[in-house]
Amino acid sequence: MKKTKTMVASISTLIRRTYPSTNQCNSLATIQSQTQLPRESLQHHSSAEGRLRFSGRVFCSESGAGCWNCGEKAAFLFCNSCRSIQPVDDSVDYFQIFGLEKKYEIDPGSLEGKYKDWQKKLHPDLVHNKSKKERDYAAEQSAKVTEACRTLTKRLSRAMYIMKLNGVNVNEEETITDPTLLMEIMELREAISEADDSTSLNQIRSQVQEKLKQWSDSFVEAFESQKFDDAVKCIQRMTYYERACEEILKKL
């Protein structure tokens, strides 16, 4: 137990270290050249956008595709003309599904509420009298809505997704050679391994979540400034702390 407390204190010291601002993301002390990511890790692509349309609590997105049944312009889920369930439209992004502004910072409560509304509309009991084709479409829509909610709920996956929408695919597995960060991660993993009770684990978890939030905040600053190289580095650091949280949850 004494050793565990010592390791927890070590992590506390790590958390209290001076945290680099976004402007410092690309140069941690004197090791800038070691942390520079290769350009090959960034792949650009274009993304299609639909038009948001709101009616009461109904949030949907229209695309250029017409209804498969009647040919009218169809919404994300149901055709407004014949009420046929529509197939998944890949041009509708995750933010549009929930009627959210396309930005990194979101309201978790709003996301959860709209997710539940979508799931009610897609519940098997409500579509059981539809054709097999439409029931299959409903199942596919439900899977996409669930994946969209899961992606937008977590800081890391949301950061990667919004970067993708802006034409940058992030390889979060890119090897980081920053010795300072690698030392922090090594000490963090050791602390998690040595922790032998829920109190110690929850204490470490709280500190790791603080670190994760700090890098998340730096990502926001870099992303909004369109400093995508810095944003990528923030995401890769967020990846390490996200995995640390997962390791802790497995032990709790």
Curated annotation (Swiss-Prot):
Family, per entry: Belongs to the HscB family.
Residues of the signal peptide: none
Disulphide connectivity of cysteines: none
Organism superkingdom: Eukaryota
Subunit structure as annotated in this protein's UniProt entry: Interacts with ISU1 and HSP70-9/HSCA1.
GO molecular function, one term: ATPase activator activity
Domain J: 93-165
Protein's name in the database: Iron-sulfur cluster co-chaperone protein HscB homolog
Function: Co-chaperone required for the assembly of iron-sulfur [Fe-S] clusters in both mitochondria and cytosol. Required for the activity of iron-sulfur proteins such as aconitase and succinate dehydrogenase. Involved in iron homeostasis and may take part in the control of iron translocation from roots to shoots.
Organism field: Arabidopsis thaliana (Mouse-ear cress)
One of the GO BP terms on file: [2Fe-2S] cluster assembly
